């Protein structure tokens, strides 16, 4: 028997996004070409529902990543993101350590939330985060990728719709989310702000009565 809207508990995350677990990711790179330029930093944050059915950040992971063999390093990109790839204090690990490490966190959250797959949430998801993540997956021949193969939530698009702003810092300002420009272009910091922004938009829609969907 098919569940009606009234029977579905939308305070459970598995019912909010059709069985998908939103996972916010961001990357820092040594260029703009996902196939040739190094992936240098990866951060991810899972989301959950609180007792009132509001979306909030949950677990996080963060990796500094060593350039893959033969990777291109663009000095201008390093100047932009402030990463010193030769600094031993980075504690950089290989892609084949970082990516599976993120998978472990995502699968654990999927099990806890009763979700079947993860779905990437990222700012400008179709460019840096999506392209570089997918390229790294292929390079290390990763097995059992927990994420949907093509569906993503792009917070730039969503923020343009909700707030009239597509730039992360400007969207956060409109959403009353503190943003420290000095910490921007750190994968972890940008992921934290993107997670807050996505949650704010989802929760705003809930408060405005736009979700759950109206019953017939």
Curated annotation (Swiss-Prot):
| Ranges of residues in domain Exonuclease | 23-198
EC number per UniProt: 3.1.13.-
Give the record's cofactor note, including how many are bound. Binds two Mg(2+) per subunit. The active form of the enzyme binds two Mg(2+) ions in its active site. The first Mg(2+) forms only one salt bridge with the protein.
Q: Look up the record and report any one GO term of the cellular component aspect.
A: cytosol
Task: Name its species.
Answer: Mannheimia haemolytica (Pasteurella haemolytica)
**What is the protein's given name?**
Ribonuclease T
Residues given in the record as Mg(2+) 1 binding sites: 26
Binding of Mg(2+) 2 occurs at 26, 28, 185, 190
Q: Which Gene3D superfamilies match?
A: Ribonuclease H-like superfamily/Ribonuclease H
User: Which family would the database say this protein is a member of?
Assistant: Belongs to the RNase T family.
Signal sequence bounds: none
Q: Subunit comment for this entry?
A: Homodimer.
GO annotation (BP), single: DNA replication proofreading
Q: Which residues form the active site?
A: 185
InterPro entries xrefs: Exonuclease_RNaseT/DNA_pol3, RNase_T, RNaseH-like_sf, RNaseH_sf
One GO molecular-function annotation for this sequence?
Answer: magnesium ion binding
Domain of life per record: Bacteria
Q: Required cofactors, per record? A: Mg(2+)
Q: Pinpoint the site Important for substrate binding and specificity.
A: 80, 150
Disulphide bond pairs: none
């Amino acid at each position: 028997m098919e569940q009606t809207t009234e029977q579905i508990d939308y305070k459970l995350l598995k019912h909010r996004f059709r069985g998908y677990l939103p996972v916010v990711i961001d990357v820092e790179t040594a260029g703009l070409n996902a196939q040739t330029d190094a992936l240098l930093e990866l951060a991810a944050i899972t989301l959950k529902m609180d007792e009132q059915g509001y979306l909030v950040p949950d677990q996080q992971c963060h990796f500094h990543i060593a350039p893959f063999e033969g990777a291109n390093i663009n000095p201008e990109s390093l100047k932009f993101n402030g990463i010193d790839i030769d600094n031993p204090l980075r504690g950089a690990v290989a892609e084949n350590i970082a990516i599976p490490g993120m998978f472990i966190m995502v699968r654990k959250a999927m099990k806890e939330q009763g979700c079947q797959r993860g779905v990437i949430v990222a700012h400008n998801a179709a460019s840096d985060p999506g392209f570089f993540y997918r390229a790294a997956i292929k390079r290390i021949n990763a097995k059992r990728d927990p994420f949907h193969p093509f569906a993503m939530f792009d917070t730039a698009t969503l923020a343009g719709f909700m707030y009239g702003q597509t730039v992360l810092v400007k969207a956060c300002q409109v959403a009353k989310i503190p943003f420290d420009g000095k910490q921007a272009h750190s994968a972890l910091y940008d992921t934290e702000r993107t997670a807050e922004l996505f949650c704010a938009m989802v929760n705003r829609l809930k408060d405005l009565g736009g979700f759950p969907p109206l019953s017939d």
